[in-house]
Amino acid sequence: MSNTQLSYKDAGVDIHTGNELVERIKGDVKRTRRSEVMGGLGGFGALCALPTKYKEPILVSGTDGVGTKLRLAIDLKKHDTIGQDLVAMCVNDLIVQGAEPLFFLDYYATGKLDVDVAASVIKGIADGCEMSGCALVGGETTEMPGMYHEGDYDLAGFCVGVVEKSEIIDGTAVKTGDTLIALGSSGAHSNGYSLIRKVLEVSGANPADLLEGKPLSEHFLAPTKIYVKSILQLIKQTEVHAIAHLTGGGFWENIPRVLPANTKAVIDESSWQWPAIFNWLQEKGNISRYEMYRTFNCGVGMVISLPEKEVETALALLEQAGEKAWVIGKIEHLGEGEAQVEIQ
């Protein structure tokens, strides 16, 4: 039995600090608000109506993290954009099915809450929500003494979107003869970071070393691109058959996820140049071409399949939206024993 009266704070959990964080982030949460959201922060659950423009609304959900990119961000003390990465990983998975993101929730866990760090992370989450037009409606911030090393934290995100039932994009419309359009990435996005950290280790490179005039750290911590508004415009004005989000598994595993069993994607490797950071990784890590395309996006964030007649319009729309877009390949019939992705 303790001779002194114990409190939760004595055990390492400071409720006052948590309340201070809530006050700090209220403004960031408010700027993401959508008209469908009811109430504010502090409720047991977040309430959101379905947008009235949908006749047969289908909800689409997704959850994700940022992998070990978070380790790099913590080590380099750059916390302001990792939240955008978190949102991007979730909303980009929704938009490929044609879904407009509605609301987002985050999970932030740490051993001892640092209000400044947490507020910076959540501001980044709000930035990402603003970019994708979805509301940050709540989340969980938990202080768990003994569970994390000092200064460490973990992040997860959850998003819900909506799509008209008749407009779901699921790849079933993909046909032989379709053209493939690529959307450029902002860097490695949030995949392959365990290998990136290994390359940094074995090469002895310093994150402050320059590549094309920028520190390696800037290349590696460039926030994941959010494609929501560009793709929403595209699918409103053109016929889109499928969209693949190039995340873990790269080209080899993500493109087949949206292809009918009798088709293959033929990628023209000469249609683009890898951004310098991917060439650096391949050289310093002695990584095979196959492994590069399995682990990294190599400069391609999305691959879109659409009819050839839509290509000119699609490229113009994407350019207007500020995207780097180009024809990267085509859909062909899959022969016996062939792989569903060929990179030539």
From Swiss-Prot:
The gene is purM. Coiled coil: none annotated. Pfam families: AIRS, AIRS_C. NCBIfam families: purM. The keyword Nucleotide-binding applies. This is Phosphoribosylformylglycinamidine cyclo-ligase. Belongs to the AIR synthase family. CDD domains: PurM. Its EC number is 6.3.3.1. It catalyses: 2-formamido-N(1)-(5-O-phospho-beta-D-ribosyl)acetamidine + ATP = 5-amino-1-(5-phospho-beta-D-ribosyl)imidazole + ADP + phosphate + H(+). It comes from Haemophilus influenzae (strain 86-028NP). PANTHER family: TRIFUNCTIONAL PURINE BIOSYNTHETIC PROTEIN ADENOSINE-3 (PTHR10520:SF12), TRIFUNCTIONAL PURINE BIOSYNTHETIC PROTEIN ADENOSINE-3-RELATED (PTHR10520). Keywords: ATP-binding, Cytoplasm, Ligase, Nucleotide-binding, Purine biosynthesis. One of its GO terms (biological process) is adenine biosynthetic process. The keyword Lipid metabolism does not apply. GO terms for cellular component: cytosol.
